[in-house]
């Protein structure tokens, strides 16, 4: 990692959690994690808890992130939330394009691009998720899939890219206990950075942080974080328990600094 990129550790709670769990999590994090320059730590709780968690976490140390948002400001879109609402709540980050949105809810790359552009236009930082299925990995189709997921972002300006953090999550590793080897993850991150360099600019490629996600825990993040193109972790189940998530933060961050 170069000195120009921020290292991110994020927790995606998905459809999990409760007020009592978040109370315990925020207490543990507030007491046990210190500020570190060039490191951003965020939690993405379920929607009903966004403001609750924001009021509990030390906002000087941590950020709260939404798990999704829609591509317009308001309207007859039952069950959706808008980037405008997140801004109104003071939520600075939003995850867009997670594999569960793509594969379970059939969100297209076109919609994901629209949502990203709109969120960025309101000043939100977008955690843009990419990733391939196991069949794609086995058929050596990973680079093609990632290129297809990225292609519409070639037209984004450097200013827009400055509000994007990539999260590479091989779908076959999410929640399965399987994890890409450090070299596999590094090679894929290098490909993503090369794509950005060729399609957008070399400067944007150097500055864009690329996180890894997929069954990350305190044990495997040691070696993953040593890779030069891995700029953080998007953590799932292990972010639900304070001690587990804190262990990942304390295990990963020192390896970079």
UniProtKB/Swiss-Prot annotation:
The active site is at residues 98, 169. The keyword Transcription regulation does not apply. Substrate binds at residues 12, 14. One of its GO terms (cellular component) is cytosol. One of its GO terms (biological process) is glyceraldehyde-3-phosphate biosynthetic process. It catalyses: D-glyceraldehyde 3-phosphate = dihydroxyacetone phosphate. Pathway: Carbohydrate biosynthesis; gluconeogenesis; Carbohydrate degradation; glycolysis; D-glyceraldehyde 3-phosphate from glycerone phosphate: step 1/1. It is an enzyme of class 5 (isomerase). Its EC number is 5.3.1.1. One of its GO terms (molecular function) is triose-phosphate isomerase activity. InterPro entries: Aldolase_TIM, TIM_sf, TrioseP_Isoase_bac/euk, Triosephosphate_isomerase, Triosephosphate_isomerase_AS. Keywords: Gluconeogenesis, Glycolysis, Isomerase. The keyword Transferase does not apply. NCBIfam families: tim (TIGR00419). Homodimer. Belongs to the triosephosphate isomerase family. This is Triosephosphate isomerase. It comes from Dictyostelium discoideum (Social amoeba).
């Amino acid at each position: 990692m170069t000195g120009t990129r921020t290292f991110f550790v994020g927790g995606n709670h998905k459809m999990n959690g409760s007020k009592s769990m978040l109370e315990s999590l925020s207490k543990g994090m507030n007491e046990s994690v210190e500020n570190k320059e060039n490191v951003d730590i965020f939690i993405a709780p379920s929607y009903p808890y966004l403001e609750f968690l924001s009021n509990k976490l030390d906002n000087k140390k941590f950020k709260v992130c939404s798990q999704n948002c829609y591509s317009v400001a308001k309207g007859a879109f039952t069950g959706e939330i808008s980037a405008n609402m997140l801004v109104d709540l003071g939520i600075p980050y939003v995850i867009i394009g997670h594999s569960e949105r793509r594969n379970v809810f059939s969100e297209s790359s076109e919609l994901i691009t629209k949502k990203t552009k709109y969120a960025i236009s309101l000043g939100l930082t977008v955690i843009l998720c990419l990733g391939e299925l196991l069949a794609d990995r086995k058929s050596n189709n990973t680079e093609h899939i990632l290129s297809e997921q990225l292609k519409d972002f070639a037209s984004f300006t450097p200013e827009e890219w400055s509000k994007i953090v990539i999260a590479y999550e091989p779908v076959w590793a999410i929640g399965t206990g399987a994890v890409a080897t450090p070299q596999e993850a590094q090679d894929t991150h290098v490909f993503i950075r090369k794509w950005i360099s060729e399609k957008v600019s070399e400067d944007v490629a150097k500055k864009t942080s690329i996180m890894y996600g997929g069954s990350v825990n305190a044990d495997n993040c040691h070696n993953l974080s040593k890779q030069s193109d891995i700029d953080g972790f998007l953590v799932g189940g292990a972010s639900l328990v304070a001690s587990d998530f804190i262990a990942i933060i304390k295990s990963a961050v020192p390896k970079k600094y």
